[in-house]
């Protein structure tokens, strides 16, 4: 029985995701599928539009057999940390044969070549990088030019400018770094770019779908999302549990910043950026506006988003030194095939499986990472318009199909 692993966010699940899932199954000829999925906060540095259990329902209805949560410390981090945490978790299951991911490039050999150079940093690459850095350009631009020089490929700039290619390269780096035996596959992304905000083409991006939902609701999305996604979103919105956006947390974040809660313990914060964020918090009470005030050529919006989310969730950079990847397997949902795989994982994986949250202290010698997931849910539910009770992880049932 071939087992396929994929890394997802499904924020929300749309037809492009369905295409990737079905094509991955055909390409790898795997009979079973495991998804490692971001929880209530995602890699863009913002809350998911609906909670992790609603998105697990979408995944299972689409044909995923087992959904495992990616710890929030990795789910909300840089592309490099996100990829490493997710790949390490997939590999730690010890049953995954194939791993399929989307990319704009769609060429595994080309992406692997780039990943190997970035991971191994051969002397000729380091020399070129050093030369370009001396000229005063940014590290990202220097890296791009150095790669272009050593690989002799004029498309490097184009490859490194798109989010799925960047993640694909990080996935391949992580597989190589941990010496994984999982076989990678990439599928060329179809339709709009991940960051596109326009609803158009055969497959619309998740960003454009979210924008449409916040501005106009669910009407007009039938062409871009499966019926089950629409039904799950509709039910969630009727219960006032979404759509959730970063703006819901504006007051909390502005309060923390005006109170000068230290930022220097957060990953990727420099002194100049810290002061700029503090100053901006006195000029607005809206987090989206704050990011526009801080954003510059040097400080990208993505970097600022990640800092704000880590401030909101109290995630400090020390946690990345304490752990080398996730130290548990948190199950969110499964079907009958998923149940079979869980039995195999229990036999083969060195990590404890958590299906009953109340038992986490007995199962984990270090509970810090898991408790961040619990806290993230408690923060997330503050955005609900009706009830914002804490401790939802302890009482929400597993999603079973």
UniProtKB/Swiss-Prot annotation:
It is an enzyme of class 6 (ligase). It catalyses: cytidine(34) in elongator tRNA(Met) + acetate + ATP = N(4)-acetylcytidine(34) in elongator tRNA(Met) + AMP + diphosphate. ATP binds at residues 7-20, 102, 164, 189. It comes from Thermoanaerobacter pseudethanolicus (strain ATCC 33223 / 39E). Gene3D superfamilies: HUPs. Its EC number is 6.3.4.-. This is tRNA(Met) cytidine acetate ligase. GO terms for molecular function: ATP binding; ligase activity, forming carbon-nitrogen bonds; tRNA binding.
């Amino acid at each position: 029985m071939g087992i396929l692993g994929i890394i997802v966010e499904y924020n929300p699940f749309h037809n492009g995701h369905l295409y990737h899932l079905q094509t991955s199954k055909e390409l790898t000829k795997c009979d079973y599928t495991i998804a490692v999925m971001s929880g209530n906060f995602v890699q863009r540095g913002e809350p998911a539009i609906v909670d992790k259990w609603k998105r697990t329902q979408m995944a299972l209805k689409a044909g995923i057999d087992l959904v495992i949560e990616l710890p929030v410390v990795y789910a909300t981090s840089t592309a490099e940390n996100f990829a490493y945490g997710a790949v390490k978790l997939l590999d730690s299951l010890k049953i995954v044969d194939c791993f399929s991911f989307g990319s704009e490039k769609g060429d595994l050999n080309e992406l692997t070549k780039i990943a190997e150079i970035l991971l191994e940093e051969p002397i000729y690459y380091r020399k070129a990088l050093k030369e370009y850095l001396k000229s005063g350009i940014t590290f990202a631009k220097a890296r791009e030019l150095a790669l272009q020089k050593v690989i002799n490929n004029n498309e490097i700039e184009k490859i490194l400018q798109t989010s799925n290619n960047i993640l694909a390269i990080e996935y391949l780096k992580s597989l190589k770094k941990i010496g994984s035996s999982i076989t990678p596959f990439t599928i060329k992304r179809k339709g709009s770019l991940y960051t596109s905000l326009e609803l158009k083409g055969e497959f619309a991006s998740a960003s454009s779908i979210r924008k449409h939902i916040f501005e106009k609701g669910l009407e007009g999305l039938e062409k871009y999302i499966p019926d089950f996604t629409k039904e799950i979103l509709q039910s969630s919105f009727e219960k006032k549990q979404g759509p959730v956006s970063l703006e819901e947390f504006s007051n909390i974040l502005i309060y923390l910043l005006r109170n000068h809660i230290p930022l220097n313990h957060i990953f990727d914060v420099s002194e100049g950026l810290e002061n700029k964020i503090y100053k901006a918090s006195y000029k607005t009470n809206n987090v989206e506006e704050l990011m526009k005030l801080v954003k510059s050529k040097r400080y990208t919006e993505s970097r600022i988003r990640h800092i704000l989310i880590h401030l909101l969730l109290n995630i400090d950079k020390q946690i990345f030194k304490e752990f080398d990847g996730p130290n548990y397997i948190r199950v969110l949902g499964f079907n009958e095939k998923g149940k079979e795989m869980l039995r195999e994982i229990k036999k083969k994986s060195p990590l404890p499986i958590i299906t009953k949250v109340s038992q986490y202290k007995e199962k984990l010698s270090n509970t810090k990472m898991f408790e961040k997931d619990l806290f993230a849910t408690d923060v997330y539910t503050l955005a609900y318009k009706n009830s914002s009770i804490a401790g939802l992880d302890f009482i929400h049932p597993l999603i079973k199909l």
